[in-house]
Amino acid sequence: MLFERVVRPTLFRLKGGDAEAAHEFAVRRLAGLARMPAALAVLRARYGVSAPRTVFGLRFPNPVGLAAGMDKDGLALPAWPALGFGFVEVGTVTAHPQPGNPRPRLFRLPDSGAVVNRMGFNNAGAGALAARLAALPRPLGVPLGISLGKSRITPLEEAVEDYQTSYRALREYGDYFAVNVSSPNTPGLRELQDRAHLDALLAALVGEKPILVKIAPDLPEPAIAELLEVCLARGVAGVIATNTTLARDGLAPADQAGGAEAGGLSGRPLADRAREVVAFVHRETDGRLPIVGVGGIVTPDDAGRMFDAGASLVQLYTGFVYRGPALVRAAAAAARTP
């Protein structure tokens, strides 16, 4: 395939293999394409796929979405549906602009089909994203999700107000909102998965738009069950399972050094655990809570198995980095009839 033979090797060589430089280059190029209707039409003709379904009241052209983190500030929004994605999630965005953690903070583990990141919610802030979305022609053509996180400078006891600030700024633009309380790269953030913190946060956010909670794969099942009790009691629209993991199981020998970098691991080694969490959530809620499955989807079969585990929708990030847009179409084709 063109992507795997030409595009990926070229990107992976940029600036001596700097993964974040390649990421930024790719998003800039896609942002340029997003301003070229003829180019978008060509991409849609090649990669577009129709497998519609309705989940939490939203109509999705197909059930394969772009995960948060790929286009944090929404720079290339019109390009992603043209590459076949049935929905797009931007962010994670915070109330305050922040630079994130020092570079280098993004590392590819190619033999394992994985990535380690410790980005730290680098983004231009909720206000800047709102201004960008306000200037875009609408509708986008696919549902737009917005992932919300806590600003690093905000103490945990003020987290609710911090999330509310972002939500209010972006409420009219997002079709759904993902509450990210599970990134391992913001100190103390995962404490917001605890019952009391999560209950207060959801009480402040649930209502007008569908709210989803993104959970960590590292939580034991009793903790996930407790989290789900809060989600059901507060009427969330769904769960995103899962975020990146702190575990390093399943890495190829050649990737051990890269795997030792601090941060969250995504990609193929996460597949089994992410699918286990999806299956547990599905069982624990008797299928009442829609699940967006994400983690380790690098082949169409991975997508099919995620749907079989109970996911209504899936998202790609690391698999897209390694396989390109052909994976989007193939993953959508692997979706089972809901």
Curated annotation (Swiss-Prot):
Binds 1 FMN per subunit. It comes from the Bacteria. GO terms for molecular function: dihydroorotate dehydrogenase (quinone) activity. One of its GO terms (cellular component) is plasma membrane. The active site is at S183 (nucleophile). Belongs to the dihydroorotate dehydrogenase family. Type 2 subfamily. Catalyzes the conversion of dihydroorotate to orotate with quinone as electron acceptor. Monomer. This is Dihydroorotate dehydrogenase (quinone). It comes from Salinispora arenicola (strain CNS-205).
